[in-house]
């Protein structure tokens, strides 16, 4: 019967898992190593058949010169279009032919180029990534085609006010600073970019000492290092001057932009803590209580569940190396903007004025820890998170260490942070209506 089948299957399953785990027993926990040319390598073993690896470069939109706005993202697109030994078609097919995936994204402070593949194809993925990161040629004919693709991307983005407003809000609070720039750039400037402009940008930033190579997968660390030394022996160490200019003093602003949309879109927020600030974890927890992804967030309960005024309301936190952004967003009927703004301000005031009880705080911590745990069930996100953390902090924190930091937060710290971040005179507002 079914029980016998289950029992007969069990020993084989156990032995497979045991063999895998035995192969990795000496490797549990992450490993790191620095090559002679300055490239930092980090590896986290996993029991999955799928592995991830890639390069995270410490260069993003904020590192562009005035006349190269959009260049970091432009380079991220063009890096797949040709190297000294491969045409675009060969790059495209190299991982696709074995069912793998090549991907990349650009942020304000980093660019990440990575691949997902069955573990047995690690060598193929690493060799291809090393080729495109260090030996791209940016063919002019490919630039002309890709410029059109990026302009289409910009136009589709501009048709989505609920996304566009986030960029416009950063432009408002970092006025005149590269951090306020749109990652995609602007079409007029993009059309002026040439092959040598892309090469100039990569020659400033795409060097081993300014990036990390990350691997998440069932691989031996020695094997990774051996291959790295073989593939990257010819890549020289170059000192990169990437000292960033911090944004000037913050002045809260209020701005209304007239848009031809059915819905009004509203952002309320301010500058937040930078990535190295000890209070960042407390603000992270406050943000989750206020407008995190849970349906029981205070803003969702007040604006949507009780009153049906909005479809979407949320609050967000972004930390950069020398500053940050805290913001709340909602979309509503233009007639309801004032009511919704009043309700958001009321929730912010509650967090400033009322100390949380120990029961409320324990429940909030439990929810956040649970959400982080569920999110960590995705190895692609884990690999990218590890890359970003190692790039900026030169260390990798386990989930348990993050949970510990959350557990240490007291009601007093939350009250102090709420009064620093949510003070009414400190908030900026941007409205599309």
Regions found by a protein language model. Name each.
Residues 18, 34, 90-246, 256-257, ...:
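Charge-rich, well-structured scaffold segments of protease-associated domains
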Residues 19-50:
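N- or domain-start disorder-to-order transition segments that initiate the globular core
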Residues 24-27, 240, 248-250, 296:
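Short solvent-exposed loop/turn micro-motifs enriched in small/polar/acidic residues
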Residues 38, 45-95, 169, 206, ...:
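Active/ligand-binding-proximal structured segments within catalytic/core domains
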Residues 252-254:
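Flexible, small-/acidic-enriched active-site or ligand-binding loops
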